Amino acid sequence: MADELENLTGVVEGITYRNEANGYAVIEVKTGDEFVTVVGVLCDITVGEQIVFQGEWTMHPNFGRQFKSVRLTRSRPADASGMHRFLASGIIKGIGEATATKIVEKFGSNTFNVIENEPERLAEIKGISKSKAKRISKDFKMQFAARDVMNGLAELGFNQQEAYDIYSVLKSDSLDIVNENPYALVSLVGSIDFARADEIAMNMQQAPPFDCRCQAGVTYIVRHNLFNGHTCLPRNSIIKPAMLLLECNEDEAEIAIDNAIDAKQLVEENIDGKAFLFLPEIYEAESGIAERIKVMIEYPPAPKEISPAEIDAFEKTNNITFDEKQREAIEIAVNKGLLILTGGPGTGKTTTVKGIITLMENRGLDVALAAPTGRAAKRMTELTGKEAKTIHRLLEVEYKDGATEPSFAHNLKNPLECDAVIVDELSMVDVTVFSALLDALPLSCRLIMVGDKNQLPPVGAGNVLADLIKSELIGVVSLDKIFRQAMKSKIVSNAHRVVNGEMPVFDNSVDSDFFLLRENSKYNAAGKIVNLVTDRIPSGYGFDSVRDIQVLCPSRKGEVGTENINALLQAKLNPPSYEKNEIKYKGYTLREGDKVMQIKNNYDVPWFKDGENGTGVFNGDIGILTRIDRANDIINVRFDDKEAMYSIENVKEIELAYAMTVHKSQGSEFAAVVLPTIATPPKLSYRNLFYTALTRARNLLIIVGNEASVKAMVDNDKKSRRYSALVHFLSVDNVAFFK
């Protein structure tokens, strides 16, 4: 690619826009007699710098010709005029316009040499003390040290974004680490994968040792499989992938694994006589969960005995009647403080949780509510009447520049200030988040875990809810009685039929909430979905096409996948207009007014809400794209009641959300759901995916397909295998606390 890039050399004359979070900037550069707009990741650029940019010319729809830089080489200003502009920019602490003028007038083109090598001479200038001179010199050296590192990374072949990410994590050690072993970046810097590290290594004058490459390769295979939900992998299962990736033989692959273990890049654990490999941080999280759970069992909170009469009083006050299992759940939660509460729709989980909250608070206990996503937390708040927070917000997420995982203000050293935590939608919580939550619980804190064991496992690694239930160490109350009011809903009754492997009953009568719109053609199905969302459902039920109706697709691809359905619905609900700005990215268009979804956690995006501000948007958040500001390359998205502001470089983190995959819908509830089942890929045609989709609908569910496609999903109770070790670690013999 480097051969295709053009060079542009010039002096920075002005900075139009800068995003401190990701380094993106818009600057004005003077090259000869011409002024050029340069855009890209331009870290710590200052007025007066002379820079060689590498990139390509682009045409901005509003602002014309621009140079998009992907690499740059910086040189220090060589003349007095350039030095003055640089110092006057304010980048060096203690030097403003007036001081910069005094320094350059005295030392001329020798200014930088004096600051760097003879800082005591700065004290010859009135207003600069010896101590201030030392501070100026120190800050000056730090500024150019960063520039030297960025230049060095560019010379090795990294683009500006990669160099920024590397420097954010490794700081002044960046070049030393990369030159010694570029493969170390695969585990240290989230944006550098094995293929990219391999490319850099192959172009280095002195390639790193072969064993460094092999260790990184086998570690990468284990890390990559986190995205498939595995916390660990059988050792023998990565031999062939390693041989293909590294182009090595079996013995070399085995040696690479052993070396990675010796280097603490992997951890090996014997589980039922079979060797499994973990990333160290996942091993620590999963084994740590087990140890914390064991401690909670061994040292329970002081009992807060509850009498049947108190539960009776709650029933009378709220005009409800608990069944036997609900009463059992309340007693365990209040008295013992450790409980898993499961149940499908209509079984009274929410009512039970309300009872637990009230009876705990009646005993003076401070109760915190949490859920894995913003949508799930909002729903929990609405159902319980008590504020629920995302787990990240409850723990006060902190995210350091370039880090691949967040840290939290609340942890073992700084626990939460509460007596009980109730966490909903536990089936969505992965091992790293659950481990962080347990670490933040104070001693003797009650923990009530609520979820539906029949829903999909989390997108992240692990299977926490299923593994905790399987361990049989924690009290589990499974609510299975469908209450009379809920039984009126065909959505609820059919969801329970599906769980039991029975076909749903299709009742297409006017007063039903569960319909099958029969269709055998995937092409016709796409058109019918659009008609349902844009016309039939809004006119028949009064639901808003964007706010209330959600299309859930098993797959992203195909005629009835999210990509095609989103394009069709966008064209109908939010067509192009001269009054609406838009941006194109990888073949699709985002337009002002579009329904969009955040597809990865980003802890740096700033947001504003009724005078309050903060940072962080999360995977699965749904909002409306309210503004595309091409002048400053900024986009705004309104998520519920907060407005987030993105650099246009982060457009890759949002996508259209008129339709979403069933996996992305976890933890959400929509007034109306449209679910295509026709042409579902066999690997996605299974029962708990179908069940999860059904249980996302509150008032209306319309399936577009046929009985055969539904039956294929109901009959397939095979779950994709997830390797995890929580049950193993929870066994008595494998937890250090009990040894």
Which residues are covered by each model-predicted region?
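Conserved RecA-like ASCE P-loop NTPase motor core of nucleic-acid helicases/translocases
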Residues: 339-381, 450, 514-521, 536-558
